[in-house]
């Protein structure tokens, strides 16, 4: 069938109209405001990086300037500003589809996905940009992407030209010891962590596979998690500009931000199970228990504290309290003329490495029963609990006829004092517990007592303490460490 000229013209007109409609529709789906906001145009494939702004103070910030600086470089740049709750005063953010505010705290009237930051990120890469940074040079994010792809590090970073630019650090995180240790980076600019202001870029899948991807302070939480996984960060020879109107410009604003930042950091470290931070130069920061708080663990069942089931050892703050209590108690006993010696697991720790066993939760000392009357605190404890001038609590233990010295009224980390007396050349006592090492022994192990380093001081110990320990625990006990109740949890089987 042949087409007439009229039919051919009609078909051509319909085809042309369809092409025009398709083109108009395509234009409508392009980013608005391609009104010469900046010198660069979006690549044909679209942006590969989402700018994520998390670290800022709601009461004083330069977030609008930060966001605008990235949009100047690329009007289609995806930007997510993340906050726990709606910032107040409100942020003056542009009302365009590629700039979004993510509220991370769950709310009754919002779906679960709304509080998950990954909901807002559709790009392969994420750039964590701190408040006070500004994008002035074109192509910085793309250069960071290329550096990440070309190198072996899982993160790359570019310092921000503020008063506190990023510096490279080594970081070792030991969950078992509840400790983070910072030091000089031996292979800078390849680092374990950064201290200071930097834009950090990584793959979105890596960021959102972390257990707390946007916990604040972002720098602290991010690098604790990445260093634990062995992910390096490469500090690049690129620099982001500082804000033209920097945040926290007044002394009051800086004071408020520092105060809230310290509280936020302490809460984060406690939540992540870090009780001690060690810095280069020997400075220590403690985030665990003290005399005014309770200890870090609850009642011990079956001689196996809860932290052992978590594949952790005694928190360092608890070990510090035990060392302090042991040193103090030994000083009181020596001043009063009470003969004492390291007992049980405490003697075992001293024999192994001169300290408390890393998973132990108390200190044991034996004393001569006949010397109890020499010590004012022990005499007082016979009648009831005594709090001395240093805040230590001396009391008779409820479990039996022995004494206990607690770190404080709040914190019940303690030293147990076991009164022994000689009978026919054998040391015995009136209270026995269901422990293998709780047995009688010949008095000749105490004649004489010998000095032995323990927990930062020198304590008295039985002579021939190896034989003494093997009598109580069995052969090879010094060389073969084991948890206190292997039937419940074995050191070799705990992972």
Swiss-Prot record:
Pfam families: FKRP_N, LicD
Protein name, entry field: Ribitol 5-phosphate transferase FKRP
GO biological process: adult walking behavior; basement membrane organization; bone mineralization; brain development; camera-type eye development; connective tissue development; connective tissue replacement; creatine metabolic process
Description of how the protein assembles with itself and partners: Homodimer; disulfide-linked. Tetramer. Forms a complex composed of FKRP, FKTN/fukutin, and RXYLT1/TMEM5. Also exists as large multimeric protein complexes. May interact with the dystrophin-glycoprotein complex (DGC).
Associated pathology: Muscular dystrophy-dystroglycanopathy congenital with brain and eye anomalies A5: An autosomal recessive disorder characterized by congenital muscular dystrophy associated with cobblestone lissencephaly and other brain anomalies, eye malformations, profound intellectual disability, and death usually in the first years of life. Included diseases are the more severe Walker-Warburg syndrome and the slightly less severe muscle-eye-brain disease. Muscular dystrophy-dystroglycanopathy congenital with or without impaired intellectual development B5: A congenital muscular dystrophy characterized by a severe phenotype with inability to walk, muscle hypertrophy, marked elevation of serum creatine kinase, secondary deficiency of laminin alpha2, and a marked reduction in alpha-dystroglycan expression. Only a subset of affected individuals have brain involvements.
Cytoplasmic side: 1-6
Subcellular location: Golgi apparatus membrane; Secreted; Cell membrane, Sarcolemma; Rough endoplasmic reticulum
Keyword flag Cytoplasm: yes
The UniProt record lists the keyword Membrane: yes
Cofactor(s) recorded in Swiss-Prot or TrEMBL: Mg(2+)
Membrane topology: Single-pass type II membrane protein
InterPro entries recorded: FKRP_N (IPR055105), LicD/FKTN/FKRP_NTP_transf (IPR007074), LicD_transferase (IPR052613)
Region (Zinc finger loop): 289-318
PANTHER family in the cross-refs: FUKUTIN RELATED PROTEIN, RIBITOL 5-PHOSPHATE TRANSFERASE FKRP
Effect in UniProt of substituting residue 455 to D: In MDDGB5; severe form; brain involvement; intellectual disability and cerebellar cysts on cranial MRI
Residues that span the membrane, as ranges: 7-29
Pathway: Protein modification; protein glycosylation
Glycan-linked positions: 172, 209
Top-level lineage group: Eukaryota
Effect of residue 362 to A: Decrease in ribitol-5-phosphate transferase activity. Does not affect protein expression. Loss of ribitol-5-phosphate transferase activity
UniProt catalytic activity: 3-O-[Rib-ol-P-3-beta-D-GalNAc-(1->3)-beta-D-GlcNAc-(1->4)-(O-6-P-alpha-D-Man)]-Thr-[protein] + CDP-L-ribitol = 3-O-[Rib-ol-P-Rib-ol-P-3-beta-D-GalNAc-(1->3)-beta-D-GlcNAc-(1->4)-(O-6-P-alpha-D-Man)]-Thr-[protein] + CMP + H(+)
Post-translational modifications reported in the UniProt record: N-glycosylated.
Gene Ontology cellular component terms for the protein in this record: cytosol; extracellular space; Golgi apparatus; Golgi membrane; nucleoplasm; rough endoplasmic reticulum; sarcolemma; skeletal muscle myofibril
Protein residues bound to Mg(2+): 360, 362, 364
